[in-house]
A protein has these predicted regions:
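Generic detector of multi-pass transmembrane helix bundles and their immediately adjacent loops
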Residues: 267-405
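N-terminal positive-inside, membrane-proximal cytosolic segments immediately preceding the first
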Residues: 1-9
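Soluble non-transmembrane domains of integral membrane proteins
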Residues: 42, 49, 63, 71-236
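Juxtamembrane loop-transmembrane helix junctions in multi-pass integral membrane proteins
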Residues: 7, 248-258, 311, 335, ...
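Cytosolic-side membrane-insertion boundary helix
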Residues: 238-267, 285-287
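Hydrophobic membrane-insertion alpha-helices, especially the h-region
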Residues: 10-28
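Alpha-helical transmembrane signal-anchor/signal-peptide segments
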Residues: 28-54
Length: 405
């Protein structure tokens, strides 16, 4: 076992090694960010072109000509709406990004009314969610007398029908489409919605409603996984739109870059523990030992960054962590024996592995840093409470006089 005297110069040398390693991590994180962001735009375009864009289905609108109105028409809302939506989540991966793609089966039955005491030619318009999406098994059936052929113009189907006074005609619409990120049903800012019900079924358990949309009035969990959600509006004024965000996925690129950017903080804690416990136990390491330890820690993020797009992200993370732990702890065991390994192994596992793994969960990295810092402070305060710090930093002349180099 090799022992070295702890001096102020050796601490400066360790600090220089730390700074150089931190610069390396920043370069690695920047390269990962550039690698991810440089292709994200083109990959997003490819996904939208091959799979489909975000889908926003609008509530149908209807009107009849009314010369008495300033606009020349009077709007009517469906007197009854029964909408069924089935969402199937199928994320797709391209490069270092997962894209939250899904399939939707849409089916709706509406009743289009004529609220006047005379027969009216009512025009019904149904807008498709996006002009860039494809719609399989599409049906649009408007029953009634004098129905013209539907006209498709700029993503909106318009059809006219003659409705007897104080009567309704049924409208049926259904299709199968594919979309990205979230699905939404827009009520077109209707001031009043009556006899409306939307039933949504998902095959995923993590549900999140986009900002500005309403929560369901009823929900029940499906035994096979997923939810049955219902929005029931018997008579609502100012009803909000209805939407569903697809579950979040772990994107390897952003996670790998964040781990690299925050790795210097982990190394700072790790080096602090080794320096202080070295002063307590008398097992002080040479700055060159710290150089190899920094390289072993750097190997974790380096391996993770360049294998994360080749294998599942969790498997890649734990394999990279295992390699780094083996390098660092194996080296310390060879240098300082079991006494040093018993200190370094839990420290590296806590600061490097657990802290890095917290980036897999939103909002936990800051809490992990705070808890780790407080626990580290408590352990170091207890370990050094009875230590005579005046004997730790030895003057250079005394070192040379004693012959301990």
């Amino acid at each position: 076992m090799h022992k070295y005297t702890l001096t102020f110069r050796s601490i400066l040398a360790v600090g220089f090694i730390f700074i150089c390693t931190a610069v390396g991590w920043f370069i690695l994180g920047g390269a990962l960010t550039h690698r991810s962001m440089d292709r994200s735009g083109s990959l997003m375009y490819e996904v939208q072109a091959t799979w489909g864009p975000q889908l926003r289905q609008a509530h149908p609108i209807a009107w009849y000509e009314s010369p008495a109105n300033a606009s020349g028409r009077s709007s009517v809302s469906p007197s009854m709406s029964r909408v069924q939506v089935d969402l199937q989540y199928e994320p797709k991966r391209k490069g270092l990004f997962w894209y939250r793609t899904y399939q939707v089966q849409f089916a709706a039955n509406y009743e289009i009314p004529n609220p006047t005491p005379i027969a009216q030619t009512v025009y019904v318009a149904f807008s498709l969610p996006s002009a860039d999406a494809s719609y399989n098994n599409f049906t649009f059936e408007l029953e009634g007398a004098g129905v013209d052929e539907p006209i498709l113009r700029e993503g909106t189907i318009t059809q006219a029908v003659v409705i007897p006074p104080q009567s309704t005609v049924p409208l049926q619409v259904s299709y199968h489409a594919r979309g990205l990120n979230h699905w939404e049903y827009d009520l077109n800012g209707a001031s009043r919605v009556q006899n409306f019900q939307l039933a949504m079924q998902t095959d995923f358990e993590s549900v999140n409603f986009p900002g500005g949309t309403a929560s369901p009035t009823d929900r029940s969990e499906v035994a096979t996984g997923g939810w049955d959600l219902i929005w029931d509006y018997p008579d609502v004024i100012g009803a909000q739109s209805i939407g569903m965000d697809m579950p979040k996925v772990l994107n390897p690129g952003p996670i790998a870059s964040r781990i690299s950017f925050f790795a210097p903080l982990s190394l700072l804690f790790f080096f602090a523990v080794l320096l202080i416990f070295g002063a307590v136990t008398g097992i002080n390491l040479h700055p060159m030992n710290y150089f190899f330890l920094a390289a072993g820690c750097f190997a974790f993020q380096l391996l993770f960054a360049y294998t994360v797009d080749l294998m599942p992200i969790h498997l890649c993370f734990f394999l990279s962590a295992a390699v780094s732990l083996l390098l660092v702890c194996g080296y310390l065991h060879a240098v300082g024996g079991r006494a040093l390994t018993r200190i370094a192994l839990p420290a590296q596992f806590a600061y490097m592995v657990l802290f890095s793994y917290s980036f897999f969960f939103d909002g936990l990295s800051g809490l992990t840093i705070a808890i780790g810092a407080v626990l580290t402070l408590a352990v170091l305060m207890r370990a050094t409470a009875k230590m005579d710090w005046s004997t730790v930093f030895v003057a250079r002349k005394r070192v040379l006089a004693g012959g301990d180099r």
